Amino acid sequence: MRVLGIETSCDETGIAIYDDKKGLLANQLYSQVKLHADYGGVVPELASRDHVRKTVPLIQAALKEAGLTASDIDAVAYTAGPGLVGALLVGATVGRSLAFAWNVPAIPVHHMEGHLLAPMLEDNPPEFPFVALLVSGGHTQLISVTGIGQYELLGESIDDAAGEAFDKTAKLLGLDYPGGPMLSKMASQGTAGRFVFPRPMTDRPGLDFSFSGLKTFAANTIRSNGDDEQTRADIARAFEDAVVDTLMIKCKRALESTGFKRLVMAGGVSANRTLRAKLAEMMQKRRGEVFYARPEFCTDNGAMIAYAGMVRFKAGVTADLGVTVRPRWPLAELPAA
């Protein structure tokens, strides 16, 4: 069985084809980073228009890459939410239209479930149960996962997501969009310990996060210490260390409260090398395992949507003739498979 996956929730157009026996057959991705760079962030209207231009050509490229034709596709999966409403509607409309034209099922996919299941695409996929850390520009959540659709929210950010805090702090440091990866690169040249940032909400019980205060702390630190290159690198290092330590502390608490031995990390920020190293070290000490997707599957992509669509289709999930998206869509509302 082969599923075509379409991802258009924000500023990446991702198309992939997944075969339940052969694995990933094609993966095409177009990033709009250059389009939005001059604005310092994603402009929803521009994102939607660019998805309109790129989605169909990328589908054609994916079919060519896989050596397939439309008649070889058994189902079409598309991101139905959460995300930017206009961007979601592009992918949903194309996906639903193709499914109708090809006379195959259409499968609406939850964007964050796609991220959560992305490590399943690797050679050594995690087994249930596990604690999942979903960490991206729009979400920071800890979730107890005991099966497909069996998700319990343990904690989440009460303000900025970790990825959003990275991007905002990068902007304060004068870095271009997207700032998160550039801040991490700058942090690698920084001196540890010159500046010490707080670890928000780690001095109290619970698994919720708060990252907005770190941005304010960074702004005050920059204002008080000048902006020579080394100082900026040292501030970037202090900021990254604070975010990574906070995530690690909360993950440890979540593992202790659930008793699970496996940790899955997913979402754009999961590509951060410092975070990966710290969590791997923590799990080694706990005699547990940590799992994550390869870097290209940490950010938005069609492969995770094709795979999640395959899983959901086998569980009996399909869409009706309507084109419906949900810009806000709690993961806990998904049915168990």
From Swiss-Prot:
Keywords: Acyltransferase, Cytoplasm, Iron, Metal-binding, Transferase, tRNA processing. It comes from the Bacteria. It holds the Pfam family TsaD. It is found in: Cytoplasm. Its EC number is 2.3.1.234. Its cofactor is Fe(2+). It is an enzyme of class 2 (transferase). GO terms for cellular component: cytoplasm. Binds 1 Fe(2+) ion per subunit. The keyword Metal-binding applies. Its main location: cytoplasm. One of its GO terms (molecular function) is N(6)-L-threonylcarbamoyladenine synthase activity. The keyword tRNA processing applies. Belongs to the KAE1 / TsaD family. Required for the formation of a threonylcarbamoyl group on adenosine at position 37 (t(6)A37) in tRNAs that read codons beginning with adenine. Is involved in the transfer of the threonylcarbamoyl moiety of threonylcarbamoyl-AMP (TC-AMP) to the N6 group of A37, together with TsaE and TsaB. TsaD likely plays a direct catalytic role in this reaction. PANTHER family: TRNA N6-ADENOSINE THREONYLCARBAMOYLTRANSFERASE, TRNA N6-ADENOSINE THREONYLCARBAMOYLTRANSFERASE, MITOCHONDRIAL. This is tRNA N6-adenosine threonylcarbamoyltransferase. It comes from Salmonella paratyphi B (strain ATCC BAA-1250 / SPB7).
